[in-house]
């Protein structure tokens, strides 16, 4: 039996903690087969991003075409796409090949709060890419930007998830890892939860786990989204895939919390 095939479309992290490298490691660890399309080459490490070199849009298209024509992935995970022309290229390819599952981790804002793409690119993403996605996984800053209001707690997370889902006709997972408190809370809004899902009156599903203190969290968003894509490719319903992916992330954080790789925010 063939393993599920997952295509990651994202940037390269030379230090191995995030981006394509984190996606490949995650997909492989969960029993999938990882293919990759690189949208940008970054010079970065645990201390930060030093330089970014965008891959030309025609080369991004060539990579996607090569993978799609031969492998036909069961799911696609999209990460760093900070140029409008690359977004349009990806959208054109997705419309041509129509993969069943598309998970997008919108890398729009850095950890320090700096925007990583222009307003033009954000608008193209909103109007062209979002409607094609199965799931979008913004963190608090990104969800606040998309929603137009600051999110400070789980009440706003639920409101944002529901309204963004209706606005863009896709499922939304708002990640609350940066919330104050002892728990790590994420909120999912999807149209068709599984029969056993614990759905709130708002229609949202709240995932809450004790927060694990660790300096090794670089690549957490990449790992979560690629894990969700892998579980979706394996036949899980969306809320089940999110639940399993969060369990995987929790285990990874706990097992790696005492490691010392690099001098800054270490890899997950």
Where are the regions a protein language model picked out?
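Conserved N-terminal subdomain of the carbohydrate kinase-like
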Residues: 2-8, 28-111
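Short pre-catalytic strand/loop immediately N-terminal to key active-site residues, enriched for Gly-Thr
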Residues: 9-15, 204-219
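Short, small-residue alpha-helix embedded
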Residues: 144-145, 214-238
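Phosphate-handling active-site elements
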Residues: 30-35, 199-206, 231-245
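Short, well-structured alpha-helical segments that form the helix of a local strand-helix-strand
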Residues: 157-165, 205, 237-253
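Conserved phosphate/ATP/ADP-binding segment of small-molecule kinases
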Residues: 119-204
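N-terminal basic/disordered segments at the start of proteins
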Residues: 16-32
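Charged C-terminal helix
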Residues: 54, 239-268
């Amino acid at each position: 039996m063939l393993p599920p095939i997952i295509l990651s479309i994202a940037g390269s992290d030379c230090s191995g903690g995030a981006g394509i490298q984190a996606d490949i490691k995650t997909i492989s660890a969960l029993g999938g087969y990882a293919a990759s399309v690189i949208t940008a080459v970054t010079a970065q490490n645990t201390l930060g991003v030093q330089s970014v070199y965008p891959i030309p849009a025609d080369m991004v298209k060539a990579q996607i075409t090569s993978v799609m024509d031969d492998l036909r992935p069961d799911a696609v995970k999209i990460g760093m796409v900070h140029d409008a022309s690359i977004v349009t290229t990806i959208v054109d390819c997705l419309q041509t090949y129509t993969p069943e599952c598309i998970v997008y981790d919108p890398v729009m804002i850095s950890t320090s709060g700096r925007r990583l793409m222009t307003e033009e690119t954000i608008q193209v993403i909103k109007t062209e890419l979002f409607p094609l996605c199965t799931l979008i996984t913004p963190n608090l800053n990104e969800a606040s930007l998309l929603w137009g209001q600051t999110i400070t707690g789980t009440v706003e997370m639920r409101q944002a998830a529901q309204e963004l889902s209706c606005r863009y006709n896709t499922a939304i997972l708002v990640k609350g890892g940066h919330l104050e408190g002892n728990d790590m809370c994420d909120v999912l809004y999807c149209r068709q939860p599984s029969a056993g899902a614990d759905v709130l009156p708002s229609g949202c599903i709240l995932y809450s786990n004790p927060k694990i203190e660790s300096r090794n969290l670089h690549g957490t968003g990449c790992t979560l989204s690629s894990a969700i894509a892998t579980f979706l490719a394996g036949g899980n319903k969306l809320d089940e895939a999110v639940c399993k992916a969060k369990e995987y992330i929790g285990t990874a954080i706990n097992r790696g919390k005492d490691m010392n790789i690099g001098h800054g925010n270490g890899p997950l």
